[in-house]
Amino acid sequence: YICACNVHTTVTAHENLDYQAVQNNSFMTLPDGKPLSSVGVRRGYSEMGRVTGPDFMEQVIAATEKSDARHYFYGTTQKNLNALLEYLKANYPQLSIVGCEPSLFRPLTIQEETELCDRINESKADFVWVALGAPRQEKFCAKLSKNTKAVWIAVGGAFNVISGVIPRAPQWMQDHSLEWLYRWSKEPKRLFKRYVE
């Protein structure tokens, strides 16, 4: 599984050793935040740049559109998934989408987890994109990816950003580490607890 780590998830991992283990045991953890990539550069990783969930997802999708790679999408609401599918079909018409399921917005039972993994295995998915929000999505990927052959990728709000449901921050805000403020202004109820704590 692959995680995208930002300041919020870094602080959460520092405070919660179980979640820290989830982040540390991932196949790859992307620096999804300018502060993290800046620290990496200062620590000697001169080419470390910011890699956001939406950017990474769209790059992988673009690179695999005309290949045999199969994609499965899990998370967000049905309405937002429909918007994502509409966008992907319009912009990547040859992309192989083999499954798409909304979040149930509650923990899955063991039976539901097993059935989800069975559906993913039956679909022969190569990539499982998960949008449940941190830290839930990373824990979800760490737990369930063991039961499939697919690469699970936790991408948070990427479904909603890529589809245009939630607009991306202007480039100048991204360049000045202010994307969090823009996102907070667009989703104050959802993000209040994250940014105030």
Short names for language-model regions:
Residues 36-38, 136, 158-163:
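Short gly/pro/ser/thr-enriched loop/turn and capping motifs at secondary-structure boundaries
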Residues 85, 138-147:
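Short Gly/Thr/Asp-enriched flexible loops that form oxyanion-binding sites at enzyme active sites
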Residues 120, 124-134, 150:
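Proline-aspartate-enriched helix->loop->beta-strand connector
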